[in-house]
Every structure is written in structure tokens, then in C-alpha cells.
């Protein structure tokens, strides 16, 4: 098995050497910051509970630091890389570091465009886990795209800027709770896993990073379905489970965008454009059991889902 072989992880010297070979100058445009500390990538793999049974998708493998740690754990890895130089070099690096017989493949593509068909075309299994040091400039859009495009992903462990990690895992009522919190919470339970110092990267970013873990809700076991939180379910004839999942997601996301566009406004005012008038917004909010004088930052993802369901049922 792969995890019984001696795979050598990349340290600072190897990272610098690889960068020189590629004449690589990390760019802010692609959000490139490479981890050069073996303990950090092992920490990420451990926090993700990666085992030999996992099919992991890694976004932005870069020079291969995290890829090697995932392979060390025995996982099957499909790496999605947008930079053709890095994508071409990665297989050789893995072989040089002792992972020649590992189950790994590289898909050269923008992560925002990668789809299930790309995995089929490459003969790769659908991912069960997303583990990545996400490009910081597009971390949230990439995260949400992957969760939506790949329902097979039941577990996520990503490294993002610390403030982004805090926002993703923020609870309703906090000053940093917002659109990313609601949208990530639509897919699963979100929690901060760790803080990573900036000195483990090359080049070192200006701020620390955070690890965020998301465990996807099983179908039918979402809190708003009454499966986990003990939340009150809708009557059988009004059940959320009867609504089209894609329409529900889009409505939740649209409502969250509108509610936080001017976060100091009451929900009645903030959602007046979405519903056509302040009165219509108030009626929808009250139908969903939500006080229209509240602000968006007070609503949980579950309440946004209930409001979305009310909205969709009203236009059937």
C-alpha cells in the first residue's frame, strides 16, 4: 500500500529548488503561496481524517506539498491545477519524492470550471473529500462551486485566509456572520479546525491562515428537515423535502445576498426588492415565522431555508 512506502515530504529547500527549476515567481493573481513545512501538511491531513479509503480532490496542488501528505496517508488523489507549468511538473516531483506508485492524477483546469465530466474523462473516481490549500483570492467561490458540483464530497478541510475562515464558521448574530457563513452552512456543519502561521509558506503571506472543516449533511438529515437540530418541521403538505433542491439552493443564496447587501437594514427593507415590495417581504417573513424587523445577521441558515421555502411555495 502507498502509505507503507516511504514518501518524502517537501521542506523549504525542496520548495525553493523546485521554484528555481520552473523559474517560478508566485503570483497574487493565482493566489500562490506554497507550504514548505511537513508538519503543517500532516496536520491538515489529520484534521481532514483522510484514510486509504478516501478519494480526495485537491485544488491548487502547487509544488506538491499537501499532495504528498495525502498520498502518505494512502488516499487516492485527483489534483486540479490551473497553472500548466505546475501541472506538468507535479507527476515528476511525486515520483522523485517516493510516490511513484501512488494513485494520483492531475486535471489541468480552472477549479471554477471543473465538473463531474472532467473526472469521468480522466478515468478518476468521484471525490469523497476536498482537502486543499485554496487560492486565497477565490477561496469562497471555489469552495461553494466544488460543494455544489460534487455531491459525492461528504467532507471538506480547506486552508484559507484567517479572516475568511472566521467568516465561514461564524455564528448568527456575530459581526462577521454573513453571506459566506450562510452559503457554506447550507451544505453542512462548518467549524474552525486550526490556525496556521504565515511562516510556513513561501512566499509568506501578510496574515495567518485558518483551517475550516465542513461535514456535509446527509440527504434528508439537514437541520431544516428535522434530522439533526430538532428544528420544527414543516407540515407534510408544505415540506421542504418536496421542493426542487436546485431551486431551493438558488433561492436561499439570493435571499442571503439581498439580506446582507446593506446589513444594517431590517429584513423587511433589505428584501423588499426581492419580493417586490416591503409589504410582500413582511408577509413572507411572517409566514416563515421570522420577525421582519430583524437584520439578516440574526438569521441562521436554517431560517434562510425556511424563508426560501415559503417564497417558493408562494409562486407555485
From Swiss-Prot:
Q: Which key words tag this protein in UniProt?
A: Cytoplasm, Methyltransferase, RNA-binding, rRNA processing, S-adenosyl-L-methionine, Transferase
Q: Which GO terms describe its cellular component?
A: cytosol
Entry's Gene Ontology molecular function annotations: 16S rRNA (adenine(1518)-N(6)/adenine(1519)-N(6))-dimethyltransferase activity; RNA binding
The compartments listed are: Cytoplasm
Task: Establish whether keyword Disulfide bond is in the entry.
Answer: no
> A Pfam family matched by this chain, by name?
RrnaAD
Catalyzed chemical reaction(s): adenosine(1518)/adenosine(1519) in 16S rRNA + 4 S-adenosyl-L-methionine = N(6)-dimethyladenosine(1518)/N(6)-dimethyladenosine(1519) in 16S rRNA + 4 S-adenosyl-L-homocysteine + 4 H(+)
Xref: CDD domains: AdoMet_MTases (cd02440)
Q: What is its main location?
A: cytoplasm
Q: Which InterPro entries match?
A: KsgA/Erm, rRNA_Ade_diMease-like_C, rRNA_Ade_Mease_Trfase_CS, rRNA_Ade_methylase_Trfase_N, rRNA_adenine_dimethylase, SAM-dependent_MTases_sf
Query: What SUPFAM superfamilies does the annotation carry?
Result: S-adenosyl-L-methionine-dependent methyltransferases (SSF53335)
The residues that the entry says bind S-adenosyl-L-methionine are 33, 35, 60, 81, 110, 133
Entry keyword Methyltransferase: yes
Give the Enzyme Commission number.
2.1.1.182
State the similarity comment: Belongs to the class I-like SAM-binding methyltransferase superfamily. rRNA adenine N(6)-methyltransferase family. RsmA subfamily.
Q: Describe the function of this protein.
A: Specifically dimethylates two adjacent adenosines (A1518 and A1519) in the loop of a conserved hairpin near the 3'-end of 16S rRNA in the 30S particle. May play a critical role in biogenesis of 30S subunits.
Protein name as catalogued: Ribosomal RNA small subunit methyltransferase A
Which species is the source of this protein? Answer: Corynebacterium jeikeium (strain K411)
